[in-house]
């Protein structure tokens, strides 16, 4: 909004020339989202506590410590993230850019699905929430609409192509199969972050790390000169997503202030589904879906642990892990919650650096 309102006046007010720089607006988005989260956070938490007298239902089969340390903590803290993210993005992004709207609407759509799930958990006191099939259908519908919208904005051979990391300007042509593939990425990312969100601060920091990396990728992929220099594909207009990513980082930092152990609030599915969907949508726009698998490798590990656990139990009657997702396995082994969280943050950082390395290792 500020870009659309103030940059046209740059001839009269030279200071407004700053708004043409993505780096300036991305920095502004980080700070704005952080400030909004700080301002609205205490009020949102107070409202959630008043509404959710007993807090989020805790799994009876989970780690025993959770029944003591997490009981009574309100959920749906994702409201704080989504509000700060949306306000900051609308202020600092170029609102004529359709990619910004695609990613923002996917984020809010998945947030709405998550809210539906959280609401049922709190109101019905049922940890399972929305039936899995209904939830999946809603996620697929939003992802399919987003993928089709992205397809309509990009020309061949880029539209139906998949970029391959570690190879110079290699694009695999998937044609119409790209649509279900993009849906799989968005839905998978949303649910992967959702599965990871089981400990205080565990999901939000890797999300911020991945968002920071994709701010860089968005900027470079959307800049013709840098894309040519790095021998990566060029997606016109995708650089504006750096502003969205910056807003996500700022909103995440603000939320972490209240989610640091012991958490005052949980993001719930309202936040985790939305943030995962956002990362998936960004990777689809920038054509770096495979890089998301590296940068968000921690989310992949958590998801695979659940798949392996369920498959093993159905096929053999035995469990591979003491409990799934993976972070609960280490808790069951005796690791303290802060130990699990910080070590997983370290893993997320290493994987993010590996993802960044794909820019030069070609």
Swiss-Prot record:
Main location: membrane
Record GO cellular component, one term: plasma membrane
Reported cofactor(s): Mg(2+)
InterPro entries for the chain: Glycosyl_transferase_4 (IPR000715), PNAcMuramoyl-5peptid_Trfase (IPR003524), PNAcMuramoyl-5peptid_Trfase_CS (IPR018480)
Originating organism: Paramagnetospirillum magneticum (strain ATCC 700264 / AMB-1) (Magnetospirillum magneticum)
Signal peptide: none
Cell compartments where the protein resides: Cell inner membrane
Reactions catalysed: UDP-N-acetyl-alpha-D-muramoyl-L-alanyl-gamma-D-glutamyl-meso-2,6-diaminopimeloyl-D-alanyl-D-alanine + di-trans,octa-cis-undecaprenyl phosphate = di-trans,octa-cis-undecaprenyl diphospho-N-acetyl-alpha-D-muramoyl-L-alanyl-D-glutamyl-meso-2,6-diaminopimeloyl-D-alanyl-D-alanine + UMP
Family: Belongs to the glycosyltransferase 4 family. MraY subfamily.
Keyword field: Cell cycle, Cell division, Cell inner membrane, Cell membrane, Cell shape, Cell wall biogenesis/degradation, Magnesium, Membrane, Metal-binding, Peptidoglycan synthesis, Transferase, Transmembrane, Transmembrane helix
Molecular functions per Gene Ontology: metal ion binding; phospho-N-acetylmuramoyl-pentapeptide-transferase activity; UDP-N-acetylmuramoyl-L-alanyl-D-glutamyl-meso-2,6-diaminopimelyl-D-alanyl-D-alanine:undecaprenyl-phosphate transferase activity
Transmembrane segments: 28-48, 75-95, 100-120, 134-154, 170-190, 201-221, 241-261, 265-285, 290-310, 339-359
Protein name: Phospho-N-acetylmuramoyl-pentapeptide-transferase
């Amino acid at each position: 909004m500020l870009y659309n309102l103030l940059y046209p006046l740059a001839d009269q007010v030279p200071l407004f020339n700053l708004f043409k720089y993505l780096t300036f607006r991305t920095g502004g988005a980080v700070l704005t989202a952080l400030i909004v989260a700080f301002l609205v956070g205490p009020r949102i938490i107070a409202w959630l506590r008043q509404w959710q007298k007993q807090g989020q239902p805790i799994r009876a089969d989970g780690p025993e410590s959770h029944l003591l340390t997490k009981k009574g903590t309100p959920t749906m803290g994702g409201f704080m993230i989504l509000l700060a993210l949306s306000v900051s993005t609308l202020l600092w992004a170029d609102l004529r850019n359709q990619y910004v709207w695609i990613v923002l609407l996917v984020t809010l759509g998945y947030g709405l699905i998550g809210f539906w799930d959280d609401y049922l958990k709190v109101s019905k006191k049922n940890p399972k929430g929305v039936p899995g099939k209904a939830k999946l259908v809603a996620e697929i519908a939003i992802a399919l609409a987003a993928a089709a919208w992205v397809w309509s904005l990009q020309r061949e051979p880029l539209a139906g192509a998949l970029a391959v990391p570690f190879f110079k300007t290699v694009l695999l042509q998937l044609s119409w199969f790209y649509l279900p593939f993009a849906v799989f990425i968005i839905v998978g990312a949303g649910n992967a972050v959702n599965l990871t969100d089981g400990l205080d601060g565990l999901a939000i920091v890797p999300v911020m790390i991945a968002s920071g990396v994709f701010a860089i990728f968005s900027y470079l992929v959307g800049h013709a000169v840098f894309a040519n220099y790095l021998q990566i594909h060029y997606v016109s207009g995708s650089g504006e997503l750096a502003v969205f990513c910056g807003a996500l980082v700022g909103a995440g930092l603000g939320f972490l202030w209240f989610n640091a152990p012991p958490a005052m609030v949980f993001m719930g599915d309202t936040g985790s589904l939305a943030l995962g969907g956002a990362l998936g949508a960004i990777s689809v726009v920038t054509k770096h879906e495979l890089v998301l698998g590296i940068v968000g490798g921690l989310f992949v590990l958590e998801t695979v642990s659940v798949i392996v656990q369920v498959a093993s139990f159905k096929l053999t009657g035995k469990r591979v892990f003491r409990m799934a997702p993976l972070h609960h396995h280490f808790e069951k082994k005796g690791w303290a919650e802060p130990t699990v969280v910080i070590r997983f943050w370290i893993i997320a950082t290493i994987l993010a650096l590996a993802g960044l390395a794909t820019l030069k290792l070609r």
